[in-house]
Each structure stands twice: as structure tokens, then as C-alpha cells.
């Protein structure tokens, strides 16, 4: 989350909705100095991702910041719930199961989806750190039946987001999304890519890596992972997503 007292402006970071791309340049105007951009311990909530605190928890534990969201112009980015659920599964496998992108198979995705669904169906008071990316998007827009966030953009309209942020703050946001799931298109070289990934990440700055990756995508050497093939429509997971995230589907559709 970004809050700018100077601009009376706020960005609510919904997990897995291009938030890193939008938030990165806005750090320059963040009055909280990155307080809501970290993983850490909270006295009441335990170990949490401060970037992804829902509006309910914000109102309870950070009433001052919650009041600013009401008073300032707040915006958020939303995403198709099916795409977002898959993206969250990929991140969970990479971040908490230490799997490389190229090691994530359809069977592994299906197994992980079943585990996540069991956890969500247990209806915890709040989602723990390992499941925070599966929070409903609506929990970052509404609180106690009231819409708190003024402006909602779909991830498909990055050009409009760029123009909106520039108009409100004078800050330039790149249209190219960060944290995309990409892979080399040629399976024969993927073992070599896996071998070199860690030293490459350690030696080459992120900005340069991102630039090179975009060039490789343009050249057809790298491409977005075909996540749609991992969990086909009409199955058990699809049914769960459509039920659990019903309000999110409506929220995304209304933003298009």
C-alpha cells in the first residue's frame, strides 16, 4: 500500500494484480516510508505481509491509515479471478515450495490447488502469510459493505493506469508488468537455464534482467507461461474459484 499525504492519494495493493509494477515508482511519494511494503511480525496478527493487509484488518489495527483511504483518492488494480488464482499458485510454489518455474507441472499445480482449496474452505479468521495471495480482491475494495476504494482499473488497461497515476502524482509508471511468469520456449535448454538462474540473479541487477527478458520475449525466445493449460475450465478448481471469488468476478467485469 502507498499513501501520499502530499497528494492526498493512495494505492491499495491487491495481491497478484500488477501491484509491484505500479507500486515501485510510487515509493518516492510514500508517506509511510515503506512501512506497508514488508513481511514482519505484528503484535495481534502474527507474521504477515504488510503490503497485503485487507481493509478489515487495516480498519481494526491501523485506524489512522484506514481513515486516510476514506479521505484521500484511493485506487486499486483488479484481475480476472481465474488468472489470478493460477498466478497465486505459481508464486506459492516458487516462494514457499522452492520450485523453479520450469519445474512446475500440471500435476503439481492440481495438487497445490487442492491443498489451497482445503485451506480456504476451513474459513480461517485471516489468511496466513503463505496464503495471503488468495485473499478475495473485494476485501481490498469494500469494508463492512461500504466501498472504500474510489477508482478500480483492470490489469488489462495498464495504459489507463499509467495516465491516471501521472495525472494524480506526476509519477511515470511503466506499462510493462513486473513479476510475469515466463519461460524459455525451447525445452532442450531449460536445464541449463535452471542451473544458471541463481548466479545470474545474484550478479545482474533486476532492472537489467527485466530489460533483457523483455528483449528475449520480443525475439520469441522467452514467452509467458501457458497457465490456462494447467487448470482447464469446467473442473473442480474452476467451480471453486467461481463460487469463492464470485464478487471478484463482478468487480473485474465492472472495471472493464
Regions found by a protein language model. Give the residues of each.
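Membrane-interface amphipathic segments in extracytoplasmic regions
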Residues: 1-256
